[in-house]
């Protein structure tokens, strides 16, 4: 116990080395004891054989040759010390690295290099640094430099795993080789002489003194302290951590290398970087700390039990991001961009001369996108009917401000240097900004834009959307979309097109939205895009249908909404919920991805309102069509909306029908009143539905619905009672349906021109004259129907006959000759009743009539 638990007086490194030395001594003593015990056993066995003679199984081994006996005597057990074993492990690791270098496998090199550094720590604690290790790290550094030069020239490209391993080795090899700089220089001057010499310690001062005897040291007496003023952060080995401007890069290097590893206290790392911000002196140090700090805050999400970022941590990350942009805006000679090399020297700070620009690896747009994604993910997991959701939604203002600020920054980079990556960054942030405004009403966008530009510095401006031109909301959305049309392609361009169509449809510009949708040809190739774009397409399609309904275009609204609402999967197609089925074949991974694609509640389209509009539009089209087909059976029956027909049939099968309890029942009851000719009750029932209050200008919508019911009621009446009229006065119809005579004449003229009504309009007498003889009577209609069914049956039989008789030459000829028909002329002369039996015939055919069947019978027998 004494060698493991002893008092203070030395740090953890010296204690670990002392313990290893004790372990080595124990191993050597155990090996010596094993050797002595083996020698004693062999000597005892030999003495027993000499005394007792050869007995047992040993008598069968008398003819053993002397050479074999001598070989057994020469075999000895080689006992290696712990030092030799570690050297062998080191050499085997070096061989693995050399083999991986031959095949350019940087993933293996990175893993084995980490293992090599762990092994060398144990070896150097007990002695000098092996020269084979110096050779390995020097050659590895040369190989890294060679690979870097090949990458810059474009001769060699690495895949994702190799690139990750290469970057890790490149960062660590330079830092590692600084401790062995003198030995590496000696090796490179004369490699052969260096390897033949004796091992030397890398740094004489680094060798820890051996502790021959462990002494117990009493702990110092605790001194009471009034407050935390005397406390300091203690690091590994009991040393006090000091944060200085010179050590900032070293601390950041340690934090970056620990990313992704287990048992990493990220909260402690965040506190460390907050202290580093306090001691940072120049813009470069602050930028580097902010970049690492924001990334570490995002890493907290991956380790937490929740799938989204905590609101407090999100706000801290957003504030750090705003501070980073502020530093970059005030120091234009420091640029954060993608695709540049990182500064490797942690001991020396980079110096920027006048007129030069220092490029720092990072991505401002990626941070803005991550903030957006984390806010969306948070809104997905919060109950939308609570005050917490409203409070969380208010953070969208800060996010939108950060997006506009990031857009202005990357626009400046793109103007300074034209390149595809920089233009792609501008497109990405503009798309994010567009996705935050396309579904909002104009009043909300105006408030959001005003608050954003007030929060930004007065000298900051955007080239795409200048500060002074943001008052016109329609012009703002059009400008963002046109910019993406010009400079982007693929998915971003398609999404920009859909956002513009959605915005136009939301603001009652149906014809512009429809024309833009038709010209984009997205309906033809939307299946080639990703799922998120398909969801946006479905939302846009639904919004166009709602816009057509508000404009009174019933046929266009029903035709547009039928693709989404007719499937019965509105919730799934619009990403507003998941339909869980009992026998679903969806894997947990697919379900998780489906939940990630769900839209926040404030972006939802009201599904109850959507269903009500779809059923109402279907009612206006289906009820007159049902009346037309019932009075004219010769017309081909067609169904416009199967969903509406199914609901109507279900309601009619009910024995007792109560009052309407929901939106769906209200529409069905209104349809039944309309079909019965009572348009006033139909209008009253339809207008009593409370869902219309959710639409803009509900009184205007109800007035439009009443007018539509009057018109469709007139059409239904004419279709139903036209066979019983010779003529009818226009004034009578106008008084019945409370429409103007001009409107009645226009509706009837349209029906006559579409050949829906066999009549003529007498404008002199103001009457409608129906033509007789054009439409069939009920008996004639039944005869035509019977004839059609008979012809269909005959055609079916002929097709069956052709399929059965293919390849039969005499299919349409009856059997000829004696005995073909049988009969009673058999007699007793060996001929049974039913005719003679021919070879191969097995007696009398079953059945009473004995009909051969001709062609049809042969086909059946075949």
UniProtKB/Swiss-Prot annotation:
Region: Disordered, residue numbers: 1-81, 814-862
GO CC, alphabetical: cytoplasmic stress granule; eukaryotic 43S preinitiation complex; eukaryotic 48S preinitiation complex; eukaryotic translation initiation factor 3 complex, eIF3e; eukaryotic translation initiation factor 3 complex, eIF3m; multi-eIF complex
Acidic residues compositional bias, start-end: 16-52
Pfam family, one: PCI
Domain named PCI: residues: 601-775
GO biological process: formation of cytoplasmic translation initiation complex
Chain intervals with Gly residues compositional bias: 1-10, 819-833, 845-862
Gene3D superfamilies in alphabetical order: Winged helix-like DNA-binding domain superfamily/Winged helix DNA-binding domain
InterPro entries for this protein: EIF3C, EIF3C_N_dom, PCI_dom, WH-like_DNA-bd_sf, WH_DNA-bd_sf
Low complexity compositional bias, start-end: 835-844
Gene Ontology molecular function terms on file: RNA binding; translation initiation factor activity; translation initiation factor binding
Function: Component of the eukaryotic translation initiation factor 3 (eIF-3) complex, which is involved in protein synthesis of a specialized repertoire of mRNAs and, together with other initiation factors, stimulates binding of mRNA and methionyl-tRNAi to the 40S ribosome. The eIF-3 complex specifically targets and initiates translation of a subset of mRNAs involved in cell proliferation.
UniProt record similarity statement: Belongs to the eIF-3 subunit C family.
HAMAP family per UniProt: eIF3c (MF_03002)
Subunit structure and binding partners: Component of the eukaryotic translation initiation factor 3 (eIF-3) complex.
Protein's name according to its UniProt entry: Eukaryotic translation initiation factor 3 subunit C
Source organism: Aspergillus clavatus (strain ATCC 1007 / CBS 513.65 / DSM 816 / NCTC 3887 / NRRL 1 / QM 1276 / 107)
Gene label: nip1
């Amino acid at each position: 116990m004494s060698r493991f638990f002893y008092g203070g007086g030395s740090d953890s490194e010296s204690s670990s080395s002392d313990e290893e030395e004790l372990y080595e001594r124990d191993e050597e003593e155990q090996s010596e004891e094993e050797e002595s015990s083996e020698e004693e056993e062999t000597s005892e066995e030999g003495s027993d054989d000499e005394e007792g003679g050869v007995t047992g199984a040993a008598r069968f081994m008398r003819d053993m040759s002397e050479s074999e006996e001598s070989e057994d005597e020469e075999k000895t057990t080689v006992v290696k010390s712990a030092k030799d074993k570690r050297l062998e492990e080191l050499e085997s690791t070096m061989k693995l690295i050399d083999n991986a270098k031959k095949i350019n496998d940087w993933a293996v090199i990175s893993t084995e290099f980490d293992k090599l550094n762990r092994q060398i720590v144990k070896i150097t604690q007990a002695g000098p640094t092996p020269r084979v290790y110096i050779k390995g790290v020097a050659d590895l550094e040369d190989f890294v430099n060679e690979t870097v030069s090949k990458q810059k020239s474009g001769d060699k490209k690495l895949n994702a795993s190799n690139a990750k391993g290469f970057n890790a080795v490149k960062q660590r090899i330079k830092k590692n080789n600084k401790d062995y700089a003198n030995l590496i220089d000696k090796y490179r001057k004369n490699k052969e002489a260096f390897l033949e010499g004796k091992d030397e310690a890398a740094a004489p001062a680094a060798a820890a003194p051996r502790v021959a005897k462990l002494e117990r040291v009493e702990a110092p007496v605790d001194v009471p302290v009034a407050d935390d003023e005397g406390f300091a952060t203690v690091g590994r080995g009991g040393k006090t951590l000091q944060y200085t401007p010179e050590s900032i890069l070293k601390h950041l290097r340690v934090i970056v290398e620990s990313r992704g590893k287990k048992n990493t206290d990220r909260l402690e790392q965040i506190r460390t970087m907050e202290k580093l911000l306090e001691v940072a002196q120049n813009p470069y140090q602050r930028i580097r700390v902010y970049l690492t700090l924001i990334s570490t805050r995002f890493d907290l999400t991956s380790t937490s039990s929740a799938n989204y970022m905590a609101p407090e941590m999100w706000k801290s990350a957003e504030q750090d991001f705003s501070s980073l942009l502020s530093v970059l805006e005030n120091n234009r000679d420091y640029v954060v961009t993608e695709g540049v090399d990182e500064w490797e020297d942690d001991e020396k700070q980079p110096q920027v001369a006048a007129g030069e620009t220092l490029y720092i690896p990072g991505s401002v747009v990626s941070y803005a996108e991550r903030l957006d994604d984390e806010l969306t993910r948070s809104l997905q997991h919060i109950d939308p009917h609570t005050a917490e959701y409203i409070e969380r939604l208010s953070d969208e203002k800060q996010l939108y401000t950060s997006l506009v600020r990031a857009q202005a920054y990357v626009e400046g980079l793109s103007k300074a240097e034209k390149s595809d990556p920089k233009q792609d960054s501008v497109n990405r942030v503009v798309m994010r900004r567009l996705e935050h405004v396309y579904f909002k009403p104009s009043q909300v966008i105006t408030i959001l834009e005003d608050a954003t530009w007030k929060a930004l510095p007065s000298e900051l401006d955007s080239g795409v959307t200048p500060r002074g031109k943001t008052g016109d909301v329609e012009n703002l959305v059009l400008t963002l979309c046109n910019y993406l049309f010009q400079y982007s392609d693929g998915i971003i361009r398609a999404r920009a097109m859909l956002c513009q169509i959605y915005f136009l449809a939301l603001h009652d510009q149906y014809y512009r939205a429809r024309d833009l949708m038709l010209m984009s040809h997205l309906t033809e190739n939307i299946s080639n895009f990703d799922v998120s774009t398909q969801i946006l397409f479905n939302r846009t399609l639904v919004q166009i249908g709602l816009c057509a309904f508000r404009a009174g275009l019933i046929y266009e609204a029903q035709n547009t909404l039928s693709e989404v609402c007719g499937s019965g999967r509105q919730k799934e197609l619009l990403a507003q919920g998941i339909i869980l089925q009992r026998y679903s074949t969806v894997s947990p991974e697919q379900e998780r991805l489906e939940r990630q694609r769900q839209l926040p509640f404030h972006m939802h389209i009201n599904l109850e309102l959507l269903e009500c509009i779809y059923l109402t539009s279907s009612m206006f089209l289906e009820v007159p069509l049902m009346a037309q087909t019932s009075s004219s059976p010769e017309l081909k029956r067609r169904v416009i909306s199967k969903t509406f027909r199914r609901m109507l049939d279900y309601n009619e099968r009910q024995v007792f029908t109560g009052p309407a309890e929901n939106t769906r029942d209200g529409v069905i009851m209104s349809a039944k009143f309309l079909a019965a000719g009572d348009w006033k009750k139909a209008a009253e029932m339809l207008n009593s539905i409370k869902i219309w209050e959710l639409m803009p200008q509900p009184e205007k919508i109800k007035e439009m619905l009443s007018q539509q019911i009057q018109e469709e009621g007139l059409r239904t009446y004419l279709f139903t009672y036209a066979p019983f009229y010779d003529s009818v006065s226009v004034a009578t119809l106008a008084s019945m349906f409370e429409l103007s005579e001009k409107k009645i004449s226009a509706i009837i003229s349209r029906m006559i021109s579409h050949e829906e009504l066999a009549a003529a309009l007498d404008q002199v007498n103001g009457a409608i004259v129906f033509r007789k003889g054009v439409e069939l009577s009920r008996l004639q209609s039944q005869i035509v129907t019977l004839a059609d069914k008979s012809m269909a049956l005959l055609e079916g039989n002929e097709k069956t006959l052709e399929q059965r008789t293919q390849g039969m030459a005499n299919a349409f000829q009856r059997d000829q000759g004696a005995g073909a028909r049988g009969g009673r002329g058999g007699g007793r002369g060996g001929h049974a009743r039913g005719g003679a039996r021919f070879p191969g015939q097995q007696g009398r055919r079953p059945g009473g009539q004995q009909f051969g069947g001709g062609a049809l019978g042969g086909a059946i027998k075949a």
